[in-house]
């Protein structure tokens, strides 16, 4: 413990394990209870039995009536109450000092760094970390136990005080116990002063009980806050990524949008027909006719037209525009479809429609097409 001696370390340890409410309670108990009982209660109750007068000459009647009126001396009862209530705090303080001295004998200890807390080491309480990172032992559980005992003792002595003495000292006390004959009236000395002292000590006891409850609640909340949470692995934090973005997708730094992969090129379709359609749109007339013998010629002319197309045109635009306004885009889509599917090179001639022309007209059209 560099720069801190044994006494200073013990004081720091005790100070860190006692809350502000506990310190206020200690001051209240020592000043307002013990000093008032010793300095003010003793003169008031010193001659209590001598001044207790009964209106009878029967021997022993006054002593019996005084025993009924005050089975226990008020002064002794309050002294026992104060000592018993202070006893749990004294035991806790001795325990803390003993453990602190044991820790000091082991040598200087430091609080672990924040990066070491994930490995399971106990973190020092934030309110107990002094300059230099001095580690102070935590006795929160023992402090809560001592508070429970102290509060129970306070409540028990309060109930017993009410059963024995009540709240006020009476002016006279009727007594019917033998050897008294009939009802005997006994008179108490200084009843007003005793009543004021009793009310003051009742208020001190109530305040002590409320401070004990408040200290207990604060200590429980502090213990819950000090409880360490589950450690978070660095790999889990890296995999979680930025909030609002799904895992595995990179984020564009400039626009903040997700980068989408290039879409798969769509399959070119001729005139909206399927992959197995044997129809190809004509360049001149739009009639669908492909004879068996001219399949190779159509394929060669389509490859020439594909070679003439400008290379700067995007593939997506050429593939997604099957209804082009010119007559050059329609024949180009069909040969590309035929080239992509080799099984379509052997196309069966479709059944001639009812409005089809004759064989001579077909030959003339074929010669013009070539």
Swiss-Prot record:
Membrane topology, as annotated: Multi-pass membrane protein
Key words of the record: Cell junction, Cell membrane, Gap junction, Membrane, Transmembrane, Transmembrane helix
Entry GO MF terms: gap junction channel activity
Basic and acidic residues composition-biased segments: 246-260
GO CC term, one of those recorded: connexin complex
Annotated TM spans: 20-40, 77-97, 147-167, 197-217
UniProt topological domain (Extracellular) ranges: 41-76, 168-196
Topological domain spans for side Cytoplasmic: 1-19, 98-146, 218-370
Skewed-composition ranges (Low complexity): 331-345
Superkingdom to which the source organism belongs: Eukaryota
Pfam family, one: Connexin
Annotated spans, Disordered: 227-370
Annotated localization: Cell membrane; Cell junction, Gap junction
Any one Gene Ontology BP term: cell-cell signaling
InterPro entries cross-referenced by the UniProt entry: Connexin (IPR000500), Connexin_CCC (IPR019570), Connexin_CS (IPR017990), Connexin_N (IPR013092), Connexin_N_sf (IPR038359)
Function: One gap junction consists of a cluster of closely packed pairs of transmembrane channels, the connexons, through which materials of low MW diffuse from one cell to a neighboring cell.
Oligomer and partners: A connexon is composed of a hexamer of connexins.
Family stated for the protein in its record: Belongs to the connexin family. Delta-type subfamily.
Identification of the protein by name: Gap junction delta-4 protein
Organism the protein comes from: Macaca fascicularis
Lineage: Eukaryota, Metazoa, Chordata, Craniata, Vertebrata
The gene coding this protein: GJD4
């Amino acid at each position: 413990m560099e720069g801190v001696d044994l006494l200073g370390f013990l004081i720091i340890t005790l100070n860190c394990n006692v809350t502000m409410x506990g310190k206020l309670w200690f001051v209240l108990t020592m000043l307002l209870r013990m000093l008032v009982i010793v300095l003010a209660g003793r003169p008031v109750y010193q001659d209590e039995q001598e001044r207790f007068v009964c209106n009878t000459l029967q021997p022993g009647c006054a002593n019996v009536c005084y025993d009924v009126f005050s089975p226990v001396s008020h002064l002794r009862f309050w002294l026992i109450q104060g000592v018993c209530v202070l006893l749990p705090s004294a035991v806790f303080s001795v325990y803390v000092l003993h453990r602190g001295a044991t820790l000091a004998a082991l040598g200087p200890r430091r609080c672990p760094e924040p990066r070491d807390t994930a490995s399971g080491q106990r973190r020092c309480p934030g309110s107990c970390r002094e300059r230099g990172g001095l580690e102070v032992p935590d006795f929160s559980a023992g402090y809560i136990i001592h508070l429970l005992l102290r509060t129970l003792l306070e409540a028990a002595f309060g109930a017993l005080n009410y059963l024995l003495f009540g709240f006020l000292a009476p002016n006279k006390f009727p007594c019917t116990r033998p050897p008294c004959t009939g009802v005997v009236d006994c008179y108490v000395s200084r009843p007003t002063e005793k009543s004021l002292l009793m009310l003051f000590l009742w208020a001190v006891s109530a305040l002590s009980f409320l401070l004990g409850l408040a200290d207990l609640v604060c200590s429980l909340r502090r213990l819950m806050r000090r409880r360490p949470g589950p450690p978070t692995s660095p790999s889990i934090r890296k995999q979680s990524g930025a909030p609002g973005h799904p895992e595995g997708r990179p984020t564009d730094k400039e626009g903040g949008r997700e980068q989408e992969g290039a879409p798969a090129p769509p399959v070119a379709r001729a005139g909206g027909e399927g992959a197995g359609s044997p129809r190809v749109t004509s360049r001149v007339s739009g009639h669908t006719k492909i004879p068996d013998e001219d399949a190779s010629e159509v394929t060669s002319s389509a490859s020439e037209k594909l070679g003439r197309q400008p290379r700067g045109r995007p593939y997506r635009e050429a593939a997604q525009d099957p209804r082009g306004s010119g007559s050059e885009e329609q024949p180009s889509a069909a040969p590309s479809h035929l080239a992509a599917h080799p099984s379509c090179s052997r196309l069966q001639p479709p059944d001639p429609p009812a409005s089809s022309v004759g064989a001579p007209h077909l030959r003339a059209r074929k010669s013009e097409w070539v």
